[in-house]
Amino acid sequence: MPISKQKWIAYAQLMRFDKPIGTLLLLWPTLWALFLSVKGMPDLSILSIFVLGVIFMRAAGCVINDYADRHIDGAVKRTSKRPLATGAATPEEAKWLFVLLVFCSFILVLFLNTYAIVLSFIAVFLAFIYPFMKRYTHLPQLFLGMAFGWSIPMAYGASIEALPLECWLLFFANLAWTVAYDTQYAMVDRDDDLRIGVKSTAILFAQYDNKIISLLQIVTLFFLGLIGYLSQLHTSYFVVLFLATLLFVYQCKLIKDRERESCFKAFLNNNYFGAMVFVAFLFGIFFDKL
């Protein structure tokens, strides 16, 4: 029996193909790691595998997230129109779609070295457990940070078969950044989450949310600056990184009054930060070769 057009649309929405921001936020640190690990242009086959892997795994993460939240999404204004909440897709379909996406990702990983294959099992584990953490801890954003950042050690493993200090500095820079921007995202849903009993850093940080987000952003910049110093990147890296800092200043102004629309706008702005840091790495790496 052929799949209807409505089902294809529901599956695409389950995978968030209509909202690419999450894919971009996962892609940027992956690109940082791929270029920084080799201090130049990564192998095109490895680059292609990781870009496709980002698309598949982000889609898988969205599907399992909606499956985990299928009983509460209908009670939250922002998520009430998701396919599982409306019945456009079934939980059984979501489970099979998740398995298919993880399988496709694993097929891609098999074209990498053993180092990356071993690390990929941790990636799947983190992607699977993250959606359920909001029921047990106020720190689900920390688990998202680990899940979104695990592409960094995988990139190093695939490229140089080693996980040097630089790799972990980049991982923790991304971890702090992810917790910061996902807290901004959680601020949008805070009232609904309090009502239905879902946990988040936005609830945990309470009236200190703005200050802690700013602190996390400072930590992100510190680690990125330290990477540039230890890796002896070209001065242009630090110039572009400074310009990226201005985006954090802008975000702090947006979330100051904790309005839903402004917090969501601040969250979306992080795409530009990730892109600017990527440009900073390109300048720092390639200008040094001139």
UniProtKB/Swiss-Prot annotation:
Any one cellular-component term (Gene Ontology): plasma membrane
Subcellular location: Cell inner membrane
Sorted UniProt keywords: Cell inner membrane, Cell membrane, Magnesium, Membrane, Transferase, Transmembrane, Transmembrane helix, Ubiquinone biosynthesis
Pfam families, A to Z: UbiA
Recorded catalytic activity of this chain's protein: all-trans-octaprenyl diphosphate + 4-hydroxybenzoate = 4-hydroxy-3-(all-trans-octaprenyl)benzoate + diphosphate
CDD domains referenced in this protein's UniProt entry, alphabetically: PT_UbiA_COQ2
UniProt membrane topology term: Multi-pass membrane protein
Keyword RNA-binding found: no
GO biological process: ubiquinone biosynthetic process
Highest rank taxon of the organism: Bacteria
Chief location of this protein within or outside the cell: membrane
An annotated Gene Ontology molecular function: 4-hydroxybenzoate polyprenyltransferase activity
Pathway noted in the entry: Cofactor biosynthesis; ubiquinone biosynthesis
Catalytic EC class: transferase
Transmembrane intervals: 21-41, 44-64, 84-104, 106-126, 142-162, 212-232, 235-255, 267-287
Cofactor(s), by name: Mg(2+)
EC code: 2.5.1.39
Function of the molecule: Catalyzes the prenylation of para-hydroxybenzoate (PHB) with an all-trans polyprenyl group. Mediates the second step in the final reaction sequence of ubiquinone-8 (UQ-8) biosynthesis, which is the condensation of the polyisoprenoid side chain with PHB, generating the first membrane-bound Q intermediate 3-octaprenyl-4-hydroxybenzoate.
Family from the record: Belongs to the UbiA prenyltransferase family.
NCBIfam families xrefs: ubiA_proteo (TIGR01474)
The protein's name: 4-hydroxybenzoate octaprenyltransferase
Record organism: Pasteurella multocida (strain Pm70)
Upper classification of the organism: Bacteria, Pseudomonadati, Pseudomonadota, Gammaproteobacteria, Pasteurellales
Gene name of this polypeptide: ubiA
